[in-house]
Amino acid sequence: MALSSWIFFLLVHGIVGGSRTCFPGCRCIVDNFGLFHSFSLTKVDCSRVGPHVVPVSIPLDTSYLDLSSNRLKRINESVLSGPGYTTLMNLNLSYNQIVKISYSTFSKLRYLESLDLSHNLLETLPDGSFLYSRLTELDLSSNKIQKVGVGAFTLKSQGRSMTINLANNEIHSIFRGAERPVPNIHSLMLYGNQLLSVPDLHGIPLRHLNLDRNPLSKIEKVSFLGLESLTHLSLSDLPNLREVSPYSFKSLTSLLELDLSNNPNLKSLSSDMFFGLKALQELNLAYSGVASLPKDIMLHLPSMKSITWGENIRCLKTVKESIFHAQKGRVRKEVLLCHDDNGAVPAQDIL
């Protein structure tokens, strides 16, 4: 049984224990598990101790280490190795002043699943930065990163999918870099960066992608090719967005939710823009500049359930049956029923 699965089992059947002697300035909380408390894991909180805290010695059974808010400027392999680091699953290095990591910085943390490097001063990510870990959650938000190579997120064991947060950096380029296996990224947050176009993420098994608050001006026909697994796409708060090309979403056959809200300079949408969105259930166009939708929009959106529109208008799809016809029987027709805070809104005002 994998270590993480065993620990999860113990967490379900365990009870909280007490504290133990800890590194000066740190706090150690022990969780005891098992029928006779025969197994324990320790959470070590060394936040706000100061830069002298590293290297910090930690108990052998440490699963969580918090080194946030310590004004740390560098962190390396020697700091994150030794007794106690073998079982480490969660490491918090947020709110420091770390300017650089290397491909070997986290190489000894073979069971690391969650890493928080947010609110630091990182500018680059070396290829294979996290290669030897078992990461499922990686937070790199609010740094100074400008360019990102996809190879930085390749793991030696590719079986587990990752959630990666790169929000609020200065990213203007995402490139393929060295030949490595495509990283297994499930969710990618890129909001609040400097991307002028949708990056090439071809082949990455993404299900969630957030590109909000970037200076994108146009969605191209090829922008989302190779992202057939995508189910949630957010393109909100794009002040420069003026055009979505026809067939831009044609490869997104699994997409369930599309957010195009708060795009005031997006004035119109063609019916061909919705081509291929057979699974789409929710479309958000709230506070956009689009005055009306194509009349035949529902032909391209057979699974649509709701459209959010204008300032606070929501349209729900329903099936309406006409009067019985001698030859055709009852004819079923899909229609939109719309309402706002004041009540019903005629669908013809929207279509």
UniProtKB/Swiss-Prot annotation:
The keyword Amino-acid biosynthesis does not apply. LRR repeats lie at residues 59-82, 85-108, 109-132, 134-155, 158-181, 182-203, 204-226, 252-276, 277-300. During embryogenesis, localized to the animal hemisphere during late blastula and gastrula stages. At stage 10, expression is also detected around the dorsal blastopore lip. Expressed in the mandibular crest segment, branchial crest segment and differentiating somites at stage 21/22. Expressed in the germ ring including the shield at shield stage and in the tailbud at the 10-somite stage. The keyword Signal applies. Disruption phenotype: Morpholino knockdown causes anterior neural developmental defects. Morpholino knockdown impairs neural crest formation. Morpholino knockdown results in impaired endoderm formation and mesoderm patterning. Pfam families: LRR_8 (PF13855). Keywords: Developmental protein, Leucine-rich repeat, Neurogenesis, Repeat, Secreted, Signal. GO terms for biological process: bone growth; energy homeostasis; nervous system development. Gene3D superfamilies: Ribonuclease Inhibitor. Contributes to various developmental events through its interactions with multiple signaling pathways. Dorsalizing factor which functions as an inhibitor of bone morphogenetic proteins (BMP) during gastrulation. Promotes dll1-dependent activation of Notch signaling and is required for neural crest formation. Induces endoderm and dorsal mesoderm formation by enhancing nodal2/Xnr2 activity while inhibiting ventrolateral mesoderm formation through inhibition of fgf8. This is Tsukushi-A. It comes from Xenopus laevis. The lineage of its organism: Eukaryota, Metazoa, Chordata, Craniata, Vertebrata.
